[in-house]
A protein has these predicted regions:
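Charge-dense, helix-prone N-terminal extensions
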Residues: 1-99
Length: 99
């Protein structure tokens, strides 16, 4: 299973989400607000600044060029820990997009 597939499965359980397909992957929006994207073996999440700061201290993360509150996650291995982080950050980003 790929990171994109993991997130697509997780996002199916969330309400009020629109998937915008693009050549580089998919962007998920809640209402008009983008909150996550996936493609090319990586994902990006729009997180609360405090959550983003903590996320950037974990393996396989870096700042995203989408903005200061976005974190790029490109795990070397898609193990249980990577899946847990991706799903948690997806849910956090989705909740934040409602505000």
């Amino acid at each position: 299973m790929t990171l994109h597939e993991v997130l697509a499965e997780a996002v199916a359980d969330l309400d009020d989400v629109e998937a915008i397909e693009a050549t580089e992957g998919v962007e998920w929006r809640r209402g008009w607000r983008p909150f996550a994207a996936a493609g090319g073996g990586a994902a990006e999440f729009r997180l609360d600044p405090l959550v983003a700061k903590a996320a950037l201290r974990t393996p396989d993360t870096e700042s995203s060029n989408r903005g200061p509150d976005w974190v790029r996650f490109g795990p070397q291995a898609l193990d249980g820990h990577a899946v847990d982080r991706a799903e948690a950050w997806l849910a956090s980003a989705w909740r934040r997009a409602a505000t």
